[in-house]
């Protein structure tokens, strides 16, 4: 897990648009057009907004409402063009920095989609690892959609339904 944590924290990705839909059809969106938005940053790295793109390195920012239970969210993200490999990670149901669910696209030698739950004192568990079926390329945009309903989690890539 330490390797995954470091990869997550070292991940540099640009998020173009984040949209969340909660149980009563409330729609919350963020197109990152407000460069003065105050970000709730977790970690010692940097998070910034410029040119309608959210960028993070060595940290991440929290969005939405932690009290939502049934919701979906989507992100459009990419790794920088000069990155060695693609690593795009997003977390949800964040209780704190250590207790949360994480979904990610990891390229390089392993072109996989990961779904895992991180927990305090090493109670981490992989919930699913699936081959992507393609090789992610740095600089290309990828879309992830996550649906959370009760104890069910569904993950879609690009335009899957």
Describe the residue ranges of each PLM region.
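Sec-dependent signal peptide recognition
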Residues: 2-10
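Sec/Tat signal peptide C-region and signal peptidase I cleavage site
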Residues: 18-22
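Short, solvent-exposed beta-strand-to-loop segments that form ligand-recognition rims
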Residues: 156-161
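Extracellular carbohydrate-recognition regions
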Residues: 23-44
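Short tryptophan-centered beta-strand motifs in secreted/extracellular beta-sheet-rich domains
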Residues: 32, 73-75, 141-149, 153-155
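Short, aromatic/His-centered strand-loop micro-motif at the edge of beta-sheets
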Residues: 121-143
């Amino acid at each position: 897990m330490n390797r995954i944590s470091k990869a997550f924290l070292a991940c540099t990705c640009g998020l173009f648009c984040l949209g969340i839909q909660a149980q009563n059809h409330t729609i919350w969106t963020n197109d990152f057009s407000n460069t003065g938005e105050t970000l709730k940053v977790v970690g010692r790295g940097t998070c910034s907004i410029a040119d309608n793109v959210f960028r993070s390195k060595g940290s991440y920012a929290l969005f939405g409402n932690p009290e939502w239970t049934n919701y979906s969210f989507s992100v459009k993200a990419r790794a920088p063009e000069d990155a060695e490999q693609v690593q795009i990670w997003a977390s949800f149901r964040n209780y704190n920095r250590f207790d949360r669910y994480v979904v990610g696209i990891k390229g390089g030698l392993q072109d996989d989609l990961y779904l895992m739950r991180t927990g305090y004192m090493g109670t981490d568990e992989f919930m699913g690892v699936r081959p992507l079926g393609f090789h992610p390329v740095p600089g290309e945009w990828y879309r992830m959609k996550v649906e959370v309903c009760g104890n069910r989690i569904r993950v879609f890539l690009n335009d899957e339904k």
